[in-house]
Amino acid sequence: MRTLLIKFKILFLLSFISYESNAQKPNILWIYAEDTSPWMGCYGDEINSLSTPNIDRMASEGVLFNRAFVPSPVCSVTRSSIIVGQSAVRFGAHQHRSSRTKQTRIKLPKDYKLLPEILSNHGYKTFNYGKADYNFVWNKSSVYTFDLKDKKDLSELVNNQPFFGQIQLRGGKNNTDKLSDSLKVDPKIVRVPNDYPDNEIFQSVVAQHYEAIRIDDNIIGEILKQLEETGLSKNTIVVYFSDHGANNLLRHKQMLTEGGLRVPFIIMGPDDYFLKNSVRNDIINMLDLSATTLAWAGIEIPYWYEGKNLFADSFVARKYVAAHRDRLDHTIDMVRSIRTNNYRYVRNYLLDRILLQPQYRDNKTYTKNMHHLYKNGKLSEIHQEIYFGERKREEFYNVEKDPEMIYNLAENPKFNEELQMHRALLFDWLSSGDMGFKSESVESLKANGEDNSWGYGVNPEYEKYRKDSDGDGLSDGWEINNKRNPDDGILFYEFDCGGWQTEGWSSEDTLSNLSGSLGYLDFNLDKEKVVINRHGLSINGSSSKQAFTISLKSESNLKISIFSNNGELGRLNYISDNLFKKLIIPIKQKVWNLGSESVSILFEGEKNSLIEIDYIKQIEL
């Protein structure tokens, strides 16, 4: 009996100590907005200077971070990274919306636990109200232990402390169609960022984003009020931030730009945790929030975490932050970026596609307007270059002077030293591992690229498993999607698909990127003879006379010869011109009828001359 009594006292004492320990831990509430750029009064924005009072109040009573950057410009990847505490490229969750099917599910490394799970194991009640969106398999019941019924009624949290919770806001996705007059923004008064056309359509896009932020600000006000009325504010740290930049601006969301990666980041709470009414100007990786959250809870930061405790006595400001862009729904890309105090370095790995390649926003008015302006020659040269121009291997911007990343300094010799330094920083970051260099499985490609609501994949990566009925090297689905005939057996290449500019043409004779602006191939004659090739064909010949027609222009006189893998098909001399000429080169029937597995075009001319090709087409004479 005495032994039982002693055991009971020990258990009571332990439970009391546990209660006391938990009571001293702060509650932590993340207010997590979708698709939101830092266009608030507290960030110096004039349009919203008096229209975001609740966010501004958080800043005045807490800490505002001026230069906070997410690890990726798309929701699922950023959310996967932050909840794990590590860049998604390290553990394979870098492709947007992975794990769509049983065959493509991604599992975290054995030891990894999600942030809420770690907190739950240390006595926290954890919840998530709204979107999760993680690119890997996870168990909701082991991660989130409490269901918040209403984001506007936090009273049920009073008896569920300490808690770690997330309240998800719609941010840029807020429906602003039926907005009250007090929240509306006149499109005529906004400033359209310099990397967009300044017309009524983009003025409306910018105005809508301001309105969306105002809606969120009202909701944040209600949340803060609930915290105060329930007494929770006395021991609750509140964090406001976003997963990436504005959703309806084409060079914000999904792009490795300042607009796509810089987000609002504000913390408020009890005095014990940070200095109130302070501003931080050091470069912040939003992965730091994961580490800082654990530090607030008094929990050791796991070995795989890349973030730092932002308020540690030993904290040292970062020299740089990195970011990555990979597949986004059906749109395949691979880009890496380094941001230092003054510069942003961008490394593009897939140069056969333009920046504005086919994507989920193609049917939006603003995307259609951009294409319309380009097609009709009404887009400025700088906007043509940004959205539809040849993809550069490297981009380098002084973002303190040029935050909209208009002027690429990568080829300016004055910046060679800085450029070399940023290359080295990228190498340093990549040395910790990047699974983006590994090709996606066919199963994953099929899950994302085939007739989904967001679009049809037109990148060359999808071609490896698709059927090509007529042997022209272009799959049936690709041809149908690009308004070609998949059964005509005709070689026809227009170079107007932004997701695969070269349409399979390649060359080993020139250092140039064959992919030119949307609608063109272009390359320099690095030597007097350059051959471009189209492999992967299965052409059976024809009973009628055939020819190749090529629309091109060049500053050099050229000798042009066409070959199949069985011999020469034809040749023609070209006289230099500054306008496109339609050339017709008759095909030698006997050679053509032997069938073709490849076609090559030999250009002979003055070294360093530029050649631009509008289309290559097989025709019947």
Q: Language-model segments: which ranges?
A:
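Hydrophobic residues on conserved beta-strands that form the core of alpha/beta folds
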Residues: I28, F65, F492, K582, ...
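Extracellular ligand-binding interfaces
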Residues: F523-K590, K607-E612, Q618
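Extracellular, beta-strand-rich glycan-interacting domains
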Residues: V399-K401, E612-L621
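Short beta-strand-plus-loop segments that form exposed binding edges in beta-rich domains
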Residues: S600-N608
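Long, internal low-complexity/basic segments
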Residues: Q24-P26, A33, S37-P38, L64, ...
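Formylglycine-dependent sulfatase
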Residues: S21-G389, P403-A424, K438, Y456-K464
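Noncatalytic modules at the cell exterior or secretory-pathway interfaces
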Residues: K590-I601
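Bacterial Sec-dependent N-terminal signal peptides
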Residues: M1-K25
